[in-house]
Amino acid sequence: MRISTDGIRNRILKKIYVIVEIKGGFGNQLFQFAFANSLRKMGYKVKVKTNFYEQFENDNFENTYRKLVLPETLFGFKKTNKLTNRLLVWAHKFNKSKKIKKIFGKRNNSFFIKLKDSDYSLEKMNKKVIHLDGYWQNIDSIISNKKYLIESISKNLILKEGFDNC
């Protein structure tokens, strides 16, 4: 019996956890959810990280006020919990630590990688946990996810009215 390479690839991808950071305003959120959906369609297990918006819960923020306009539930995603968010921070610091590199030498961490949109490539998507942080402003991603985006944001009654009035 021969196993197809697609079957093997899908089994491998289902064991890779991808966390897409959601941040910015309405437009950036659309790009990020479209990108996350593209990864999900490829077979990755995808969650979103929305704790960026917690900094705006008190009045002493320095950046432009932003609000999570599009909750992850509209798009069928689950968000990371506080423990996962802390582990991501720790894993990133561990990977970047000069002391760790000095003690253990340069090593390739096969478990975790954090990629910015400028560093992203599918070839780097080979770790057990992948944290993707960026705006992912690629119009092709929006076009290929157009139906998904419209269906998702139409679950918000205010936004649905906007589509119905067009």
Predicted regions, residues:
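Short amphipathic alpha-helix
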Residues: 31-39
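N-terminal amphipathic/basic-hydrophobic helices that include classical n-h-c signal peptides
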Residues: 1-13
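A short, glycine/small-residue-rich beta-strand->loop->alpha-helix junction that serves as a flexible
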Residues: 21-31
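Short helix-capping/linker segments at secondary-structure and domain boundaries
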Residues: 18, 41-46
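A short beta-strand-loop structural module common to alpha/beta enzyme folds
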Residues: 45-55
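Secretory-pathway luminal glycosyltransferase catalytic domains
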Residues: 12, 16, 60-166
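Pocket-edge structural micro-motifs
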Residues: 22, 50, 134
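Short catalytic/ligand-binding loop motif for oxyanion handling, primarily in non-cytosolic enzymes
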Residues: 27-29, 55-59
